[in-house]
């Protein structure tokens, strides 16, 4: 999630020192005029709608129809069953193909705002914790107050370990026992505000991102006193932002908890960083068994040096030690996590020949023939590591990066790409073979309705790249195809691979656009094969809701629903996905899942895996029908045979079918 929109930021800037969702003036939501990777360099993209335009009533979150579809662009499908579903919080209409909704676990009471009226005293109380006084609140439209207060209790990302699910929240963390997926139970609710609360887990350690200025070292809920009122800007003058006053007890960075006692996590370290931690990536170095590494992506404002020595938000030409244009690397000794510390601050955007820190301001490796001015890349939003390949993919505001992480403390940029259809490079996922990477664009920052009928299907979409000789080669875009309403925040967000052998399939969150399962085996023709969606939370108000993350873990799809709670799903067979393929995916059992630390999937030698490949060979017509029939007959005979040698031989056949299978 990135900047909501500029007008909301300007309204809140004078009063609330909130998270980076509102504080990043540098994240313009307009496309670059550089040429598209999929078009000749002479082509110029259309102009995106102006996210800075305020409504007459001063409410930037009031539903507003999309402007006319730009010439040559394709919008979203209004004939899709997901369009115009009945609104509601817990009784919204639903539409699904290939997905069965099993259960919704509502948020624990402590993690709910408990108010839908901006005049509710609970709203003012929450905003007060962010440092807003009565004078500040008088300047902020009521709908903005409500949306801001809702954000303070938003569910965020997830991590998994054994039979435990760790569900982050801007207000802390909830830990569930999922040993019985049909009846998960809440083990621990840990109140610890500071947002976003994104988690990772490794052995007995839990890591949590914190970036908001109400975060405290002691996990306290009292926040900090509001700063003194600022002078009212002159007519036409932009409000000037300054970081909140230094506080010795403020925490912005990565918390580390010992979860040896899962019901009673103990904070053992709190590593401060200049911009806080919007997200982080756990790096497990196969050559270093004694340490793990954390890549910290900070996207918020730079704090004052009086609060953390060495912090500077100056431009690189004014201060070469600026906290902009870098990430931080934390080294965590597993035997003594209390000694965790920042060991490097890699300049991923630097030109190694000239030493210029902001070298990617004018783009990456393609589109050099046209005028360029992509989003300035002074931060990464998310970095996905694939340690088995020694690679990482960085989604870094104005660019997508390919990184060499063989030396995890010193990642090196291998390639960088930009795209005029992308507003904000948000996250990334590798294919299992490491030959493709799928990036996402969070156009509108997560609080924008960006799947309306006239919103182009190349904006706020996925972009699939092939990796060839350590370079990123563009394939095509994918966007959840169904049109959504004006009150539904919708854009590409977090997802994970589903371990279907022979295919690259990902389940992905689209906020109130629901979840979409995309097959990107063919990088040039990604296609949706399953989905689930609910109607909008409210018919006439654009509020933060929907899926932050949807991840596959050990046979189920788990959805972090921002406003409602935790959803659990299972796949069902369709013409695009057979029961054998689903069963083959269920043979993969992970002991741990941190999606930004991607693991190589390996399938056991089981006959159901061979059955899945045969189904794919039949679907793609790669083998004649009589050959398909004979293979199936051989498997069926072996399953009912006592001939162990024949059965073992057929099991060995399963992986050998991989090269022939296709979709």
Predicted regions and their residues:
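N-terminal secretory signal peptides that target proteins for export/translocation
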Residues: 1-9
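Soluble extracellular-acting proteins and domains
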Residues: 581-663
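Bacterial N-terminal signal peptides
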Residues: 10-23
């Amino acid at each position: 999630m990135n900047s909501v929109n500029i007008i909301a930021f300007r309204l809140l800037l004078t009063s609330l020192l909130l998270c980076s969702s509102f504080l990043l003036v540098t994240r313009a939501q307009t496309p670059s005029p550089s040429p598209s990777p999929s078009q000749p360099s002479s082509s110029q993209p259309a102009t995106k709608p102006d996210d800075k335009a305020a409504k007459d009533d001063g409410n930037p979150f009031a539903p507003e129809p999309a402007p006319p579809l730009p010439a040559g662009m394709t919008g979203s499908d209004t004939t899709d069953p997901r369009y115009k579903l009945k609104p509601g919080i817990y009784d919204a209409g639903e539409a699904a193909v290939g997905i069965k909704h099993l259960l919704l676990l509502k948020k624990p009471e402590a993690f709910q705002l408990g108010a839908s009226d901006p005049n509710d005293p609970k709203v003012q109380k929450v905003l007060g914790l962010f440092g807003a006084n009565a004078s500040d609140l008088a300047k902020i439209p009521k709908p903005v107050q409500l949306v801001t207060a809702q954000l303070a209790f938003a569910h965020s990302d997830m991590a998994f370990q054994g039979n435990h699910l760790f569900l982050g929240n801007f207000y802390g963390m909830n830990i569930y026992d999922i040993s019985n997926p049909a009846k998960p139970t809440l083990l621990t609710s840990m109140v610890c505000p500071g947002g976003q609360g994104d988690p990772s887990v490794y052995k007995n350690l839990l890591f949590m991102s914190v970036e908001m200025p109400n975060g405290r070292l002691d996990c306290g809920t009292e926040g900090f006193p509001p700063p003194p009122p600022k002078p009212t800007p002159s007519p036409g003058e932009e409000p000037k932002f300054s970081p909140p006053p230094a506080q010795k007890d403020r925490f912005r960075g990565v918390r580390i908890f010992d979860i040896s006692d899962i019901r009673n996590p103990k904070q053992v370290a709190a590593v401060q960083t200049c911009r806080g931690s919007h997200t982080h990536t756990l790096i497990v170095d196969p050559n270093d068994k004694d340490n793990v590494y954390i890549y910290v992506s900070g996207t918020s404002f730079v704090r004052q040096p009086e609060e953390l020595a060495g912090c500077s938000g100056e431009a690189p030409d004014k201060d070469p030690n600026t906290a902009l244009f870098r990430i931080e690397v934390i080294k965590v000794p597993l035997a003594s996590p209390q000694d965790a510390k920042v060991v490097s601050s890699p300049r991923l955007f630097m030109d190694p020949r000239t030493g210029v820190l902001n070298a990617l301001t004018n783009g990456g490796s393609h589109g050099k023939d046209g005028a360029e001015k992509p989003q300035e890349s002074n931060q990464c939003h998310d970095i996905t590591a694939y340690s088995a390949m020694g690679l990482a993919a960085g989604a870094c505001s104005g660019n997508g990066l390919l990184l060499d992480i063989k030396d995890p403390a010193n990642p090196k940029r291998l390639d960088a790409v930009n795209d005029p259809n992308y507003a904000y490079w948000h996250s990334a996922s590798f294919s299992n073979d490491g030959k493709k990477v799928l990036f996402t664009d969070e156009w509108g920052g997560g609080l924008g309705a960006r799947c309306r009928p006239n919103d182009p299907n190349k904006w706020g979409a996925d972009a699939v790249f092939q990796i060839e000789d350590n370079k990123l080669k563009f394939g095509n875009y994918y966007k959840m195809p169904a049109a959504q309403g004006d009150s539904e925040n919708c854009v590409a967000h977090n997802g994970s691979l589903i371990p279907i052998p022979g295919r690259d399939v990902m389940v992905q969150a689209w906020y109130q656009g629901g979840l979409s399962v995309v097959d990107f085996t063919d990088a040039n023709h990604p296609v949706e094969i399953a989905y689930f969606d609910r109607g909008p939370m409210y018919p006439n108000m654009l509020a933060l809701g929907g899926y932050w993350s949807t991840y596959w873990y050990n046979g189920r799809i788990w959805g972090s629903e921002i406003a409602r709670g935790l959803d659990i799903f299972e796949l069902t067979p369709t013409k695009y996905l057979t029961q054998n393929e689903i069963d083959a995916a269920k043979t993969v059992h992970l002991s741990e899942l941190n999606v930004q630390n991607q693991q190589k999937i390996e399938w056991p030698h089981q006959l159901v895996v061979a059955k899945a490949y045969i189904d794919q060979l039949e679907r793609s017509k790669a083998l004649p029908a009589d050959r398909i029939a004979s293979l199936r007959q051989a498997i069926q005979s072996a399953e009912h045979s006592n001939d162990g040698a024949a059965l073992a031989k057929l099991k060995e056949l399963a992986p050998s079918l991989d090269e022939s299978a296709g979709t």
